């Protein structure tokens, strides 16, 4: 092997190593920033157990909102057709947050409850994002849930 071929070989090896390193770093960065959406039924079934941070989506159970008198801490239940998950959030809630409202909370499970660091409320109680509608429809036996589904008030 002459000097030119050796030089090209080392150049190709260096470029391939740099590309592999770049792909690995990008994959790790994307994996840390991904936030999967789960419903309360999926959380109860243990589907979210492997994730430190995830999104919880569903409806705010009527009458479950409790505000602390001495802080901005709010607790409430997020429900779907089959389950409910207790959520704790410290901060200012969106103006559209209320009972029977579609909500997505970003956070983590801690001591049997979901501790949210962000809460997003939807514009209308009949609106449901496609991702949440699809996730809730998976656990629903029977007709699929339409995008303009009525709020769930009978789940405890």
Swiss-Prot record:
GO terms for biological process: cytochrome complex assembly. Residues 1-8 are cytoplasmic. Residues 30-156 are periplasmic. Heme binds at residues 123, 127. It is a single-pass type II membrane protein. Keywords: Cell inner membrane, Cell membrane, Cytochrome c-type biogenesis, Heme, Iron, Membrane, Metal-binding, Signal-anchor, Transmembrane, Transmembrane helix. The chain crosses the membrane at residues 9-29. It comes from the Bacteria. Heme chaperone required for the biogenesis of c-type cytochromes. Transiently binds heme delivered by CcmC and transfers the heme to apo-cytochromes in a process facilitated by CcmF and CcmH. Belongs to the CcmE/CycJ family. Pfam families: CcmE. It is found in: Cell inner membrane. GO terms for molecular function: heme binding; metal ion binding. GO terms for cellular component: plasma membrane. It comes from Xanthomonas campestris pv. campestris (strain ATCC 33913 / DSM 3586 / NCPPB 528 / LMG 568 / P 25). Its main location: membrane. This is Cytochrome c-type biogenesis protein CcmE 1.
């Amino acid at each position: 092997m002459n000097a030119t071929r050796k030089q090209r070989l080392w150049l190709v090896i260096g470029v391939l190593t740099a590309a592999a390193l770049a792909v690995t770093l990008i994959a790790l960065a994307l994996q840390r920033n991904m936030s999967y959406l789960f419903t309360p039924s999926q959380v109860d079934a243990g589907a979210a157990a492997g994730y430190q941070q995830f999104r919880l989506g569903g409806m705010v159970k009527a009458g479950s909102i409790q505000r602390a008198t001495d802080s901005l801490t709010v607790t409430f239940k997020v429900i779907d057709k089959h389950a409910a998950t207790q959520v704790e959030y410290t901060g200012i809630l969106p103006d559209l947050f209320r009972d029977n409202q579609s909500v997505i909370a970003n956070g983590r499970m801690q001591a049997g409850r979901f501790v949210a660091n962000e809460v997003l409320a939807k514009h209308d109680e009949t609106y449901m994002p496609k991702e949440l509608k699809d996730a809730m429809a998976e656990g629903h036996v029977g007709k699929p849930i339409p995008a303009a589904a009525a709020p769930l008030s009978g789940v405890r």
